[in-house]
């Protein structure tokens, strides 16, 4: 599938097929945001959501490994950090965010998720965006972007997904 549109200085048609799937999802998210917020703000919205989606997937993978081990360490933060995985509290997990996608509180849910992650991961203190509850960001539109990242971006292979943040920023 080739697109003639230009986004991020690159023509979608010039991309390899391996990248088009992910970049099409970014394009779809940008199209949803188009007309609702300034184009310069897309990155802030999208990168924060991709970050949440990625760390939640990495956490879930590690959580399942710890449960399978059966030693009861699935709630021990050190069991995650020793594997270079951020601890993600319940209120910040993607499943919580996705379940709130079609509520008027979605922006607050995402901002609270960012705060919770910062509280449990001091290295991220004051780093994550917390602008999703802004009255300038239409919550219906934000919910649509969350849906795109829930339904169309596969994070099951977190090692392969590590590059998504860099690719998102470059795109």
Language model feature labels by segment:
Residues 2-171:
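Non-catalytic, mostly N-terminal accessory regions of nucleic-acid modification and defense proteins
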């Amino acid at each position: 599938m080739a697109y003639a549109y230009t986004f991020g200085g690159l023509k979608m048609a010039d991309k390899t097929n391996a990248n088009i799937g992910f970049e099409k999802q970014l394009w779809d998210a940008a199209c949803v945001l188009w007309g609702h917020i300034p184009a310069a703000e897309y990155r802030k919205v999208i990168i924060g959501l991709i970050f949440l989606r990625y760390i939640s997937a990495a956490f879930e993978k590690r959580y399942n490994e710890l449960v399978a081990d059966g030693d009861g360490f699935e709630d021990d933060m050190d069991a995650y950090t020793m594997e270079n995985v951020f601890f993600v509290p319940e209120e910040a997990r993607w499943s919580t965010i996705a379940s709130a996608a079609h509520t008027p509180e979605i922006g607050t849910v995402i901002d609270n998720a960012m705060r919770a992650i910062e509280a449990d991961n001091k290295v991220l203190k004051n780093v994550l965006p917390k602008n999703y509850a802004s009255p300038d960001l239409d919550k219906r539109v934000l919910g649509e972007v969350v849906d795109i990242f829930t339904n169309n971006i596969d994070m099951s292979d977190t090692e392969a997904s590590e590059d998504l943040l860099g690719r998102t920023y470059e795109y």
